[in-house]
């Protein structure tokens, strides 16, 4: 910000602080609520830091610098807390930090709950830092430090400013929390490598370690209880148990399932009943048991895993976890698989192709968004929803589905932006769009999102576990921003199960080899094991509607000379 603008901002800040000081006793009353302190003081403070708090630039919703959330209170351990932070501050589509506000009556220098709540949000959101304020005080917290019950207010605290210091330390505050700091890279430089933090365990690394541990726990127990299992069946079964359980746990924090429904499970038989009820509600194939009814898991293993999904054993806030983060975690998770050794022991081994490539490297979301924008931008530009309704998008080596998540998000945002610009009133009246009460946030209806997912998004992968994860990630994504009331209304109106079945969209196969290969190598027909491993894929048979309008993705790049090390066939 030019020095003259910075000086003007300081003058406005001084006036803001003086108003607060002169009426301090009034603002300290219990009747002066959070909404009032946001409007009177918090919004103006962050506007002085350069943020477009009220979207005066008229940016599309997905590109707004600041997103406001409606307050939804839930009960946990006898106390009430909100489900989402009050504000999200973003650059482009990347969230930089959350801001949680409390009314001045709440003394955040004494009460530990607000800081702990904010840190749960920031940690689960996989953010570097987040901010807590009641305007009297402003705290910046390191959100790479995992919140643990009993943490003090000072745990993971980076900076603390009293309102009487805002003027004196404005340059310092501006240098780390301003929009200019975010755009210049100063925010990332300052908070990208915070020194001296204790117990630094970012959400993505911690949750990856947890699900790896759960996989091994389940794998060993399942083989012990079901010794006839082969390795592939074991991996798919364990993956499905994890996917279903994590899906339901995420739905709990999104108010789509009763909270602690998994925590109350005491036997595997009860879990199967829960999955059967979920299958009736959601359909989608995610909860279909197939031959798995015959397999047995020890009750104690189920109980231990489910207990670790809840506070106080862990501080997960799945309501703020981006499906893309889950996809990235699973992408690393898929580097390894369970293997049953000749002596019946279960071990976790890294896939040979991953060893050769020295590990999987995730494609960051901002990169997938850029690639998808380049691929789809020219297709969608200047067209109406009717004109793009049949555009089919595919990732032919989809892995955990992150490119498909970005593609789905692109199409949803295109529809929101088009309707806002061309037929907002009609879209709201017809239900194509809905506005979250108490906010400016507009969302595409669940029915519209489901139609997009079912008709436009397709993927193929040779790894059956990747197929399971891609479906799982896309189903989480289509539920994003949908309430239980909206889903129930959709079910009552259409008589459809809530979730789409993606078996015709996301398919298992080798996208580079079809059955014509057998004409050149007839020996394949004599080797059933080789045929199963090759997973030949006939595009015309699997996707009868024909061509795709856009192919996206970032397939594994492996030198042909190295392929023989892990796939000699």
Where are these regions (language model features)?
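Active-site metal-binding core of divalent-cation-utilizing nuclease and nuclease-like domains
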Residues: 2, 45, 55-93
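Extended, well-ordered alpha-helical scaffold/bundle regions in very large, multi-domain proteins
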Residues: 245, 249-291, 394-401
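Short, basic/polar, glycine-containing "phosphate-handling" surface segments that engage DNA
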Residues: 1-24, 77-81, 85, 89-96, ...
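Short helix-capping/linker segments at secondary-structure and domain boundaries
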Residues: 49-54, 251-262, 337-340
């Amino acid at each position: 910000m030019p020095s003259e603008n910075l000086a003007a901002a300081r003058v406005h800040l001084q006036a803001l602080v003086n108003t607060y000081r002169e009426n301090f006793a009034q603002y300290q009353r219990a009747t002066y609520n959070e909404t009032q302190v946001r409007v009177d003081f918090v919004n103006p403070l962050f506007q002085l830091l350069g943020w477009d708090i009220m979207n005066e630039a008229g940016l599309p919703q997905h590109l707004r610098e600041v997103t406001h959330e409606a307050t939804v209170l839930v009960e946990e351990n006898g106390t009430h807390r909100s489900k989402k932070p009050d504000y999200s501050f973003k650059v482009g589509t990347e969230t930089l930090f959350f801001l949680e506000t409390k009314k001045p009556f709440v003394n955040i220098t004494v009460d530990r709950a607000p800081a702990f709540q904010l840190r749960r949000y920031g940690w689960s959101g996989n953010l570097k830092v987040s901010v807590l304020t009641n305007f009297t005080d402003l705290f910046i917290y390191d959100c790479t430090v995992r919140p643990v019950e009993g943490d003090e207010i000072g745990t993971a605290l980076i900076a603390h400013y009293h309102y009487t210091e805002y003027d004196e330390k404005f340059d310092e505050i501006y240098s780390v929390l301003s929009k200019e700091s975010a755009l210049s890279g100063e925010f990332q430089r300052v908070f990208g490598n915070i020194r001296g933090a204790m117990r630094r365990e970012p959400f993505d690394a911690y949750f990856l370690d947890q699900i790896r541990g759960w996989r091994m726990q389940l794998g060993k127990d399942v083989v012990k209880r079901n010794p006839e299992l082969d390795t592939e069946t074991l991996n798919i079964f364990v993956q499905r148990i994890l996917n279903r359980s994590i899906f339901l746990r995420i739905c709990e924090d999104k108010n789509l399932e009763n909270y602690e429904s998994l925590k109350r499970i005491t036997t595997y038989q009860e879990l199967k009943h829960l999955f059967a009820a979920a299958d009736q509600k959601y359909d989608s194939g995610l909860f279909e048991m197939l031959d798995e009814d015959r397999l047995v898991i020890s009750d104690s293993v189920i109980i231990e895993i489910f207990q670790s999904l809840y506070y106080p054993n862990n501080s997960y806030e799945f309501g703020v976890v981006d499906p893309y983060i889950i996809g990235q975690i699973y992408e690393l998770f898929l580097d390894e698989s369970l293997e049953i050794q000749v002596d019946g022991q279960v071990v976790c081994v890294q896939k040979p192709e991953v060893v050769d490539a020295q590990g999987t490297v995730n494609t960051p979301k901002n990169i997938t968004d850029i690639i998808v924008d380049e691929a789809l931008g020219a297709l969608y530009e200047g067209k109406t929803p009717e004109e793009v309704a049949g555009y089919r998008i595919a990732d032919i080596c989809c892995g955990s589905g992150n490119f498909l998540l970005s593609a789905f998000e692109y199409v949803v945002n295109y529809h929101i932006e088009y309707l806002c610009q061309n037929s907002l009133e009609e879209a709201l009246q017809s239900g194509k769009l809905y506005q979250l009460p108490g906010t400016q946030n507009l969302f595409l209806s669940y029915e519209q999102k489901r139609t997009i997912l079912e008709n436009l998004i397709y993927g193929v992968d040779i790894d059956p576990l990747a197929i399971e994860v891609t479906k799982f990630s896309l189903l989480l994504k289509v539920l994003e921003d949908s309430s239980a009331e909206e889903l129930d209304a959709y079910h009552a109106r259409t008589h459809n199960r809530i979730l789409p079945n993606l078996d015709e969209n996301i398919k298992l196969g080798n996208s580079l080899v079809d059955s014509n290969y057998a004409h050149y190598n007839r020996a394949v027909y004599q080797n059933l094991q080789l045929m199963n491993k090759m997973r030949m894929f006939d595009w015309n048979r699997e996707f009868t509607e024909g061509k795709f309008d856009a192919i996206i993705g970032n397939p594994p790049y492996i030198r042909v000379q190295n392929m023989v090390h892990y796939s000699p066939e």
